[in-house]
């Protein structure tokens, strides 16, 4: 899909279709009023006749509107003007793209980016329009022998901005929107891949392919032999029973002018399949445990977006690839593991494995002397119970970092909700035999998991993003969502100091 921005009057646009908004009840937007005036009341007459009420998502396609150069005009219902918010705006964009594809339009000029969305500027509206467009067009059919065909698919979208001085910010929004969309696309592709294909080695291969494309990206891998030398016994224990080798992939992006600038480190849990191990999961929906590498998919997707945007910062992405399987040599409930940090962990449940992988990685990244570390993981079902499918769980003992992350979530629409990380919860991890257990019990499960991780992050500022509820959808629309690529990408944009306001 090709995107561009321009500033101009709707009646002068030569395009297969121009898209304008209509408010409820039957009220023309400013741009629609211009078209109505040029067409001598053609549009308002249709509305008076009851052809379109203006309710959110209603569509009316007009052909050969008098005195308008475009072949078609698509009227889009936007609801009540004062109630047009972020969620409704994105839904309207998605419905518009679907309608344009159904009509066979190959190009369109969209004036919906000129609508007033509460608290949002041109940059946000253009960028969200691009991301919503690309998300709506995504499909995963790589393994289907019969692929569906879209009739004359939409190939070019032009977003109109109110004034010429906003063209630069619109172009920046396109740059960021297309980059984040590319990252989300990669995240979804990798996460949707079945576990017989997507194993830790596959994750590593995807990272290496990126390094061949982007010259400032370097990729190295650490296998089980090297992990053993490093003392990553906890990580190794989780993958011991799998026929697929555990592989930690390290992606180093050098974008800062000063190569010695401290890096931001992103760590992604990469359980390419989680059977639960000896503490075997129920069979129902176990197929979805291929998404237990959603954190790693989010990190590789964010690294893709970062490389596309060429941000002037140093970032290291870690894909903690592993597979948790049952076998005669699997680790067991009751085992006590000595982590890379030297701390010991009593295993109470082998299905609480993500934290056992992450704790060693969080110790490993100390060698980079990081500016900060953010780990992202499909860590706990408890987070899904607490927050559902809309907000990721954010944990951090560093208030400034937590506020930055929350702000990035609000900006990107990939929102997070801060959860407590109080010392009182730490007691729930007490063990009579080791320094801690890997399970704090049923109450506050997402919090005690974060408390566990916090014990391995004392040497840097750290945040933990639990995306168990947001990384994928179940049911009829089963598949990866592409999250948390938007929030992580926005965080990096902000950290890079890129100007995005008008």
From Swiss-Prot:
Sequence positions that bind Mn(2+) 1: 274, 351, 353
The UniProt record lists the keyword Acyltransferase: no
EC numbers: 3.4.11.1, 3.4.11.10
Chief site of localization: cytoplasm
Requisite cofactors: Mn(2+)
CDD domains assigned: Peptidase_M17
A cellular component term, taken from the record's GO annotations: cytoplasm
Top-level taxon of the source organism: Bacteria
Binding positions (Mn(2+) 2): 269, 274, 292, 353
Enzyme class: hydrolase
Catalytic residue list: 281, 355
Keyword list, A-Z: Aminopeptidase, Cytoplasm, Hydrolase, Manganese, Metal-binding, Protease
Coiled-coil region list: none
Molecular function in Gene Ontology: manganese ion binding; metalloaminopeptidase activity
Keyword Protease: yes
Subcellular location: Cytoplasm
GO biological process: proteolysis
Cofactor remark from the record: Binds 2 manganese ions per subunit.
Entry similarity comment: Belongs to the peptidase M17 family.
Task performed by this protein: Presumably involved in the processing and regular turnover of intracellular proteins. Catalyzes the removal of unsubstituted N-terminal amino acids from various peptides.
Designated name of the protein: Probable cytosol aminopeptidase
Organism: Shewanella frigidimarina (strain NCIMB 400)
């Amino acid at each position: 899909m090709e995107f561009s921005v321009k500033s101009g009057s709707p009646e002068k646009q030569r395009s297969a279709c121009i898209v304008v908004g209509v408010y409820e009840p039957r009220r023309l937007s400013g741009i629609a009023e211009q078209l109505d005036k040029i067409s001598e009341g053609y549009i308002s007459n249709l509305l008076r006749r009851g052809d379109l009420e203006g309710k959110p998502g209603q569509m009316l396609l007009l052909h050969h509107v008098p005195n308008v150069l475009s072949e078609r005009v698509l009227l889009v219902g936007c609801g009540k003007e004062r109630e047009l918010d972020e969620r409704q705006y994105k839904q309207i964009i998605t419905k518009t793209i679907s309608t344009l594809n159904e009509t066979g339009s190959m190009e369109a000029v969209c004036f919906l980016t000129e609508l007033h969305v509460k608290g949002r500027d041109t940059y946000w509206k253009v960028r969200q329009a691009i991301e919503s467009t690309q998300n709506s067009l995504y499909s995963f059919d790589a393994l289907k022998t019969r692929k569906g065909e879209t009739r004359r698919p939409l190939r070019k979208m032009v977003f109109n901005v109110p004034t010429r001085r906003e063209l630069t910010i619109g172009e920046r929004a396109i740059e960021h929107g297309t980059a984040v969309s590319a990252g989300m696309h990669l995240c979804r592709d990798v996460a949707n891949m079945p576990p017989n294909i997507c194993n830790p080695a596959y994750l590593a291969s995807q990272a290496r392919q990126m390094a061949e494309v982007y010259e400032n990206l370097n990729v190295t891998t650490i296998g089980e032999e090297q992990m053993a030398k490093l003392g990553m016994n906890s990580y190794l224990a989780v993958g011991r029973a799998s026929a697929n080798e555990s592989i930690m992939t390290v992606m180093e992006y050098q974008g800062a002018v000063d190569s010695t600038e401290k890096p931001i480190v992103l760590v992604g849990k990469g359980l390419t399949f989680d059977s639960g191990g000896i503490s075997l999961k129920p069979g129902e929906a176990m197929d979805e445990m291929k998404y237990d590498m959603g954190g790693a998919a989010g990190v590789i997707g964010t690294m893709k977006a970062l490389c596309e945007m060429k941000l002037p910062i140093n970032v290291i992405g870690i894909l903690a690839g592993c597979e948790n399987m049952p076998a005669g040599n699997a680790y067991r409930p009751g085992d006590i593991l000595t982590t890379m940090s030297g701390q010991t962990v009593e295993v109470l449940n082998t299905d609480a494995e993500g934290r056992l992988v992450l704790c060693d990685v969080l110790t490993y990244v100390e060698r980079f002397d990081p500016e900060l570390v953010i780990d992202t993981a499909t860590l706990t079902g408890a987070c899904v119970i607490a927050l559902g499918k809309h907000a990721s769980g954010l944990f951090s003992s560093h208030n400034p970092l937590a506020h930055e992350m929350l702000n990035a979530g609000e900006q990107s629409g990939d929102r997070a909700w801060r959860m407590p990380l109080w010392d009182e919860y730490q007691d729930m991890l007490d063990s009579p035999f080791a320094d801690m257990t890997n399970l704090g019990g049923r109450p506050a499960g997402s919090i005690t998991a974060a408390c566990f991780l916090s014990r391995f992050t004392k040497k840097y500022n750290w945040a933990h993003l639990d995306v168990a509820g947001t990384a994928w959808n179940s049911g009829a629309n089963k598949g990866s969502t592409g999250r948390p690529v938007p929030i992580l990408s926005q965080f990096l944009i902000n950290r890079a100091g890129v100007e995005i306001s008008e």
